[in-house]
Amino acid sequence: MATSPQTDPQHDDRPLPQDFETALAELETLVAAMEDGSLPLEQSLAAYRRGVELTRVCQERLAQAEQQVKVLEDGLLRPLDPRALDDE
């Protein structure tokens, strides 16, 4: 049996990674575990839920990077305010 992606199959209390690369790596690990078919149903559902959360982290980081590129393309070399993304 593959190692469990979490100890509690119903809920994962681990904090979400805040950087894109770590979130993507964890997501890829979860997908591989689910694809090999060795996880019991409850662990598969928990892995799916965690995967959705990780996907959201990745999407948010990509949106932030895209916004920074747009700012740089406009010649405005200033840090991006992440709160500006919440308004969209």
From Swiss-Prot:
Pfam family membership, one: Exonuc_VII_S
Protein role: Bidirectionally degrades single-stranded DNA into large acid-insoluble oligonucleotides, which are then degraded further into small acid-soluble oligonucleotides.
Subunit structure as annotated in this protein's UniProt entry: Heterooligomer composed of large and small subunits.
Compartments it resides in: Cytoplasm
EC number assigned by the record: 3.1.11.6
Chief localisation class: cytoplasm
Reaction(s) catalysed by this chain's protein: Exonucleolytic cleavage in either 5'- to 3'- or 3'- to 5'-direction to yield nucleoside 5'-phosphates
Assigned protein family: Belongs to the XseB family.
InterPro entries named among the record's database cross-references: Exonuc_VII_S, Exonuc_VII_ssu_sf
Class of enzymatic activity (EC top level): hydrolase
UniProt keyword terms in alphabetical order: Cytoplasm, Exonuclease, Hydrolase, Nuclease
Keyword set includes Nuclease: yes
Stated name of the protein: Exodeoxyribonuclease 7 small subunit
Annotated Gene Ontology cellular component terms: cytosol; exodeoxyribonuclease VII complex
GO molecular function annotation: exodeoxyribonuclease VII activity
One annotated GO biological process: DNA catabolic process
